[in-house]
Design a protein with these regions (language model features):
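N-terminal, polar/Ser/Thr-rich
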Residues: 1-45, 123-129, 149, 463-464
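Surface-exposed beta-strand/loop patches in extracellular or lumenal glycoproteins
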Residues: 49-67, 156-162, 448, 493-514
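A surface-exposed beta-strand-loop module
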Residues: 55, 61, 65-124, 147, ...
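Aromatic/His-enriched, Gly/Pro-containing loop or helix-boundary segments
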Residues: 60, 79-97, 133, 137-140, ...
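Beta-strand-rich binding/interaction modules
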Residues: 69-76, 462-463, 475-556
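Extended, low-hydrophobicity, Ser/Thr/Pro/Gly-biased non-transmembrane segments
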Residues: 107-225, 394, 584-593
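Hydrophobic alpha-helical and helix-loop surface patches within well-folded domains
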Residues: 199, 227-233, 237-504, 628, ...
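Long, ordered, helix-rich scaffold segments
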Residues: 487-492, 503-506, 521-525, 542-879
Length: 879
């Protein structure tokens, strides 16, 4: 990654100097097909014309380009020597005129890491598929540009592609001619027929949201129509794309249903017509992210096309992502942050709007439960790491930006906005959004621009709110204090607010406090509720004085604010015995989340949390909450349980999961969820034999359909425990000879309990760049099996020896995958903590982004050790 960075100061200096009028980009991707020549990276031709102005004639600047070679550069008609002006990442531009035209002819490399123009060869049929992914700064891998969000411009794309391909971009395109000419690119040499696709000019947009998708994609079309109050009609062509091999699984009608519901919702609430013409959505292979909001051409990871039976939680997650990306058309694409400091201006809003519209426009009316249970768990974890930061972050450069697509920017920011809606009111919030769009359309903004419109519409001082919620880090804890009078009623109920020592800010919270009692039939139901503004260290909720004594007090009932919920002794005792009796699903989700935070904070023994899951998860009606409980229970056992209790706890989890699997309604999504969890927990010989029997048909559980995806889920534990060998996995790949099948097989192969297997997997990921991003991810996932701690122990020193080299030599995406994924978290001992500290002490000059990843992993390890100590103490006292 050397030489590829761009600092905020450099970007500000360039933005003050230049303004861009237009881009014309011509790509020739006919070289994507054909055999590799083996002579260097496979490349494509990229010719870019940029027209721009300079307000200081005679000044110097630079354009961005990451390419193996540059053929020609001309500036204002003057030919420049590429060897003199191009250094591998920048093109020097000297003696600029007031009006300038830059033309760059380059050979750019196809990507195998999901950064830039990614090339994928489908193992099922040999077809080649291309797509681009840029955020935050990888469009410079495809064409020369000024790679920063505040130098917006209209774009015209022209693409030469193989004759039988279709090409898509941000604008409407058409095939205008056939061509047959020599290909100068490396990779697919000779002459090749093709078609030229030309696309309509875009509105002014940032470089990182331009997009090209090309290949023999399967396409389904539809349309959306809207008539506004003034009689104007808006028609939006809709498209949905996937690989041909996935067409039989593609439920495009559901994608279009959610898309139309979202467009209706946002038009109703934003009062600004969708501004980018068409709306295509491509589900693409080997995608690093969930999705990307390229205007008119949204890209998604193809795992959102389901090859087998999934739960409604998966459909809800897909709908949420569709709506999240759609919200970006306004928050992020129409109005864009000036620099990555204000990334939250788009991501927090899109995350909030995804759930807001999900609940308001689709069949997934319990979306706020998922938000409280899953999204906020991500935020709470991120906000307690040493790398936590304010929602408005200090982003010094592009490496900082890459790492700040995190739980703070997304989920905490969205939680803060949910709190803001409670603070200023929904009407004022949405009116502020409408003014924001109209005032800053096709422009760039900072935090102050948003605060200005919210002050106008709410009449409140947003400065103080922003200082507390957007410009400080950390999460507060809220705990109820209940004093009962002689008559057994509440004499005083107060909410106590605490902050971490490192971030002592006490914030204003709008909260609901709920009181719950057990009914005669054992249900735990709310009988009183009061909303109040919490400020300072202690706030008395006077409205609840005189109420009957509660069995449970739930601060932040209805999930209005962002905080860690704590319990008084009575409430915690009630939950230990009666959590399953909570009738309200959101209240249950909030209590489960709070109990998980207590476990992570070493305030609740891991064995107690596992016990609660075993006792009450079978009664959980919300499938998304149930699947989250499964993940938390596994994490509690693997990371937070005392080592001496792991075997006992693991056996209990497997037995409990199997019992629930057998009791679940045949064919239900709960049965499917318990089947997957049982596979995760299985380790005893009898459990592994059952999985094997379910695969070969000698065992059967009524209603459980063991489809291909479930087969792979069963095969991984069989491989990890030495039951499924290479021959078995090869036979399964022959049965499922697809891109998905290959990823599953690679993961299972790396999971096998052999020193030679681990050495081979390590070499493929750490010492070689032969694998694509998706196969790197699969190999890492298979490598680290919780049942193989001793086998993996030798890789602790090798990890610390390798990571700086990997970070320097590989792309930032692969570097992040390796540094995060191979950290020796399973070697959870003080010695590993010391080794981590030793590396940090010896590498104070390492890249800040790399140090951040190691510091985060260290914090997770230290937290795990504290949790294990808490759990061990509980075991000792119980003994």
């Amino acid at each position: 990654m050397p030489g590829e960075n761009l600092s905020r100061d450099e970007a500000r200096e360039r933005a003050a100097l230049l303004s861009v009028d237009a881009y014309e980009v011509s790509l020739d991707v006919r070289s994507a097909v054909g055999e590799d020549t083996g002579d260097g990276p496979r490349t494509f031709r990229s010719v870019t014309t940029i027209r721009f102005r300079c307000n200081e004639p005679g000044a110097s600047s630079f354009a961005d380009l990451l390419a193996p070679s540059v053929t020609a550069v001309s500036l204002n008609g003057r030919d420049l020597d590429p060897s003199e002006v191009f250094d591998g990442s920048r093109i020097l531009l000297e003696d600029l005129a007031a009006d300038n035209e830059l033309v760059v002819d380059a050979q750019c490399a196809y990507s195998r890491t999901g950064e830039g123009l990614h090339r994928f060869v489908d193992p099922e049929d040999g077809e080649v598929y291309l797509y681009t992914q840029y955020e935050p700064a990888d469009s410079r891998r495809v064409f020369a540009n000024f790679e920063q969000p505040d130098l917006k411009a209209p774009f015209r794309f022209e693409v030469r592609a193989p004759e039988d391909w279709t090409v898509w971009s941000n604008g409407v395109g058409e095939r205008i001619e056939k061509v047959r000419e020599a290909l100068p690119q490396k990779g697919g040499g000779g002459r090749r027929a093709g078609g030229v696709w030309r696309f309509a000019e875009t509105k002014p947009i940032s470089t990182y949201i331009t997009c090209v998708v090309a290949g023999p994609y399967h396409q389904v079309t539809d349309s959306y129509e809207r008539v506004f109050e003034d009689g104007t009609r808006l028609e939006i062509p809709l498209g949905a794309l996937c690989r041909k091999g996935l067409a039989k699984h593609f439920d495009a009608e559901d994608v279009f249903l959610v898309t139309k519901q979202g467009l209706d919702f946002f038009h109703d609430h934003f009062d600004y017509p969708y501004p980018f013409g068409k709306y295509d959505q491509a589900f693409v292979p080997e995608y690093n992210l969930g999705a990307m909001e390229n205007p008119g051409m949204v890209t998604f990871r193809e795992e959102y096309i389901f090859r087998g039976k999934v739960t409604q939680a998966s459909y809800e997650a897909r709908a949420n992502v569709i709506l999240h990306e759609m919200a970006h058309m306004w928050f992020g694409d129409l109005v864009t942050m000036e620099w990555w400091d204000d990334l939250w201006l788009k991501e927090s809003f899109a995350d909030f709007m995804g759930s807001f519209s999900l609940v308001g426009a689709t069949r997934f009316t319990d979306g706020w439960i998922t938000f409280a249970n899953r999204r906020k768990a991500w935020a709470y974890r991120a906000d307690q790491l040493p790398s936590t930061h304010p929602v408005t972050a200090d982003i010094r450069d592009l490496q900082d930006a890459k790492l700040n697509f995190d739980g703070i920017t997304y989920a905490k920011g969205a939680s803060v906005l949910k709190q803001l809606v409670a603070y200023v009111g929904q009407d004022a919030f949405l009116e502020g959004a409408r003014r924001y769009f109209k005032r800053h359309a096709y422009g760039n903004t900072r935090l102050g621009d948003l605060l200005a419109v919210l002050e106008e519409t709410s009449g409140r001082d947003m400065g103080a709110w922003a200082r507390s919620w957007l410009q400080t880090a950390g999460v507060n804890s809220l705990t109820p204090q209940v004093v009962l009078g002689a008559d057994g009623r509440i004499e005083e109920l107060a909410v106590v607010q605490e902050a971490a020592e490192s971030y002592p800010e006490l914030r204003p919270h709008r909260v609901a406090v709920g009181l719950y009692q057990r009914s005669q039939v054992g249900a735990l139901e709310r009988y009183a509720r009061a909303e109040t503004d919490v400020a300072g260290a202690r706030t008395v909720v006077s409205e609840l004085a005189g109420a009957d004594a509660p069995d449970l007090v739930l601060v932040n009932d209805d999930d209005l604010t962002y905080c860690k919920i704590r319990f008084d002794e009575t409430s915690l005792a009630t939950l230990r015995e009666h959590l399953g009796g909570l009738t309200d699903p959101l209240a249950r989700a909030l209590c489960w989340s709070a109990l998980w935070n207590l476990t992570r904070d070493a305030l609740l023994p891991a064995r107690d949390f596992v016990g609660l899951v075993l006792r009450f998860a079978g009664r959980e009606s919300d499938i998304g909450v149930l699947q989250m409980l499964h993940a938390w229970a596994e994490s509690a056992l693997v990371h937070y349980a005392a080592p001496q209790w792991r075997e006992t706890g693991g056996r209990a989890l497997a037995e409990g999961a199997l019992a629930e699997l057998r009791q679940a309604e045949p064919g239900s999504e709960h049965q499917l969820a318990w089947a997957r969890f049982f596979a995760t927990a299985a380790s005893a010989p009898d459990d592994l034999e059952l999985l094997k029997g379910l695969l070969d048909g000698t065992e059967e559980i009524a209603g459980l359909e063991v489809d291909q995806e479930l087969r792979w889920a069963f095969l991984e534990p069989l491989a990890a425990h030495g039951v499924a060998d290479e021959k078995v996995l090869a036979a399964e790949l022959a049965r499922d000879d697809t891109a998905s099948g290959k990823r599953h097989q690679v993961r299972c192969l790396a999971a096998r309990p052999s020193a030679a297997v681990k050495a081979g997997a390590w070499e493929q990921v750490v010492d070689s760049d032969a694998l694509s991003n998706a196969l790197v991810e699969a190999t890492i996932a298979g490598f680290g099996q919780a049942s193989q701690r001793e086998l993996l122990a030798p890789y602790t020193p090798r990890y610390f020896e390798a990571i700086e080299r990997v970070w320097t030599e590989r792309s930032i995406q692969i570097g992040m995958d390796v540094v995060r994924g191979l950290f020796p978290a399973l070697q959870d001992s003080p010695e590993t903590l010391e080794a981590t500290d030793a590396w940090l002490a010896a590498h104070e000059g390492a890249a800040p982004a790399l140090r951040r990843l190691v510091l985060e992993a260290r914090d997770d390890l230290a937290r795990a050790l504290r949790g294990q100590a808490c759990d061990a103490a509980a075991g000792t006292s119980a003994g």
